[in-house]
Amino acid sequence: MDTVSLEHQIQSVQRHISFLKKEQMALLRDLHLEILRLQKRCSELTHDLEMREAQSHQQEAASRELESKCRALESQLEARAAANAELRREVAQREALVSALRCSLRTEERRFLEELRRRSHRATVLGTELQKHTEAAAYLSCQLHAARQRLQAPRPGPGATAEPRPRRRALRARRPPAAHEAAAKGPGRDWAAWDRGAGALDDADPMPDPALFLYARRPLRPSARSPRQPPPQEPPDRAGPQPAPSQPSAPGDPE
């Protein structure tokens, strides 16, 4: 009985040992598979880490490149800001120059207008003086004509002493109005009345052209004369001695 029981115990132990071996082999296989899986996972993680490190290096290089580009752009921006400030200063200077030129142009325009006004006034004054001188020349030519007529008139005999009275009156009628009458009537009316009176007298005794007395006569050239033509006779107004007419101070002054 003891031997049978011992054999049964040995068999049971052997069965237990084989079972444990099987369990151990299964456990070892599972452990090996787990180790392989973990190794694969470690390799994957290592690869991921390496990729991430490479990406981080690339990102750092890209960030450094971007930083250098940003610095270059900042320097360009500063240069453009300085150029813009310089352009603003230049524009301000040109605006000041333009305003100064406008002021000088306005001053020159005002000065030109004043000079134009002054010259226009002087031209008016000179025109008035020229008109006065023309009237004085006409008056002097009338006096000269009257004096020549008096010199060329035949001297009356002893019995006809009363005839020159109308001539004196006619000469007095030729005189321009007096200064107080001219001031009372105005420069337009007195000369108009005097011209009408002188025109009425000139109808009876015409007066020569005043231009003959205002401009010197040009002598004729000897070559222009024909040998058959008679020599030019002296005009009657140069026949006798002529008194030099006294030039009045104003056309309205009496003789």
UniProtKB/Swiss-Prot annotation:
InterPro entries: CCDC74A/CCDC74B/CCDC92, CCDC92/74_N. Pfam families: CCDC92. Residues 166-177 have a biased composition (Basic residues). It comes from the Eukaryota. Residues 242-255 have a biased composition (Pro residues). Keywords: Coiled coil. This is Coiled-coil domain-containing 92B. It comes from Homo sapiens (Human).
